[in-house]
Each structure stands twice: as structure tokens, then as C-alpha cells.
């Protein structure tokens, strides 16, 4: 689908400050616990935005080409499995990544051209889903010419909600396919040794040398206590 799909609603978010960090924080708090991809034009901006949000105790992660591959994989996995509902990224995430269910796209920086705009917006409102795109502009910035300038201005609620806490957390296991470990082994271990019920375990992703498991956040502390020192399949 292109950037103009009727299922995609575009909003303009006006910032009175040239530095848009505070208005981004306010927007993300208002959007709540919904899968949101925030696009910046530069790697250092991604790191700066992520650092600002995390310092304000806002749960988010980052994704850009300067990161090590395992760190990029971990960030994407947490975003996919619901451990982290907000991902701050360069245009690296605008194409080719399979991340279903993204509800919001935020343009922290205006896209460099129409193609980038189309690819960014193409992350949401996919197939039969609907989605929202938010363009953050300083009050003196113009809407890029390839975007209709009669877009609706986003109105913030009078009372700003607190940051939403993710329902899931990610458990990292330092063994994977090379160790003959599979999903059934991991889930069985979590049920038997970790006291987890079926609804406490979410997405399981087994890589060559390690695995990620989504666990209900409220049960993570109890799980770590129960499995400390235990082995999966004797490894």
C-alpha cells in the first residue's frame, strides 16, 4: 500500500520548540500502549531521542545501521513481541522488515523525499489494518510539498497520561539451534521449572546461538528466581 491508503490517517503535530523531544514524549504518552515506529533522519538523532525518552522512564528501544547485529535483532524482537511498544529508528526500518501490527508511524524529522515518506508510512495500515501517521513540525516549518497541507492538526488532551508499561518482558537464553534447542524444549522448561502457565508465555524465537522468549512482565521476577541454576535439556 502507498502513503495515501485510505486506511491511513495523517496528523500534523505542532511543536512550539525547535527541539521536538518534549512534544514527542507528550505524543507517545498520549498514544499509550500501541505499537509505534518513530523515524529520525540520522543515527545520532535516534540515539539522542532514545536517551531522552529512557531518561524520562519511557520504555523504548532503538534501531539503526551502526548497531551490532545481535543488538539490532534484540531490539526488533522486543518490538515484535510486545516487550517494547516504541521503536526509534532511521529509515533502515522503513522497508524490508517484517513487523506486523504497527499502529502508528511518527515522523520526528520530515522524510528526506516522497519515496522515504511512502516507505515509512507503508509500515502501518497494511493489508486490512488501519493506522495513523504523525508529522511533527516546528511552528515555523512547512509541510513538505509532496504532502497535502490541509492535514488535521493533532489536539492533545488536557491531562497527559503517564507512560504505558509493556505487558511483556523478554527473557534471553544463551543457547540456540546449534545446541539442538527448540521452542518445545524452551516452553516445556518454563512450564515445568518456571511455574509458567500458557498465558504467561508469548512469542518464542530461537536463533542459531541464542533464543528470546516473551514472558508476562508481572511474572518475570518469579520466573528468574525459580529457574536460577536450572538447565534446559542438560545444557
Could you say what each language-model-derived stretch is?
Residues 86, 95-110, 132-136:
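A short beta-strand element within the Helicase C-terminal
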Residues 1-5, 64-66, 200-209:
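RNA-recognition motif
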